[in-house]
Amino acid sequence: MIAHLSGTLFFASDRFVVVDVGGVGYKVRVTLDTLRELRAKADKKVSLWTHTVVREDVLDLYGFQNESELEFFELLISVSGIGPKSALGILNIAPVEHLREAIAQGDASALTKVSGIGSKSAQKIVLELRDKVGGRGDEIMSGTLREEHDAIEGLVARGY
C-alpha cells in the first residue's frame, strides 16, 4: 500500500490535508499536531508516513510526522475494537511518549479522554499493549522524559 507521501501541501482542513503529488491530490487524515506542523509549511514540500485503510467502500490514508507515530497508531489499531479514527483520537490527546508511558504504567484513565473510548476500551488497550510498549514506564522512557526521570532520581538519592 501507500507507505509514504512527499509533495506540496495543497489544502488543510480541521482533520485532514490534501497533498499534491505529481498532480494528484491525496486526502490524508492527520493528528492535530501534524496538522499544525503542516499548516506552517503551506505551499511547501511536505512528507508524511502513511497508513492505508481499505474496506468495502472506503480507501483512507492516515498520515504521520514520523515513523514513531505511525508505529504507535498501528499498535493501537491492532487492539480489537479500536479503529483508525479512535486511534487518531488517542494520538490527539498527548505525545506518543506520554501515551506509551501511560499504557506501560497501566493508566487507562488517560485514554478515556477520547470520545468513543470508555473505561472498558481503555482497559483493553492497556491490557493488550502494556507488554508491547515496555511493560514498565521506566523501560520505555526516552529523550527528555528519561533525562527528567534521571535528574529526579539523582536529587532524591542526595536527599533533596
Residue ranges of predicted features:
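Structure-specific DNA junction-binding interface
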Residues: 1-78
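Amphipathic, charged-and-aliphatic alpha-helical interface segments
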Residues: 52, 59-64, 84-103, 124-137
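Glycine- and Gly-Pro-enriched alpha-helical subdomains that act as flexible
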Residues: 112-115
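Charged, well-structured binding/catalytic surfaces in domain cores that contact anionic ligands
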Residues: 121
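Strongly charged, low-complexity linkers/loops
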Residues: 124-160
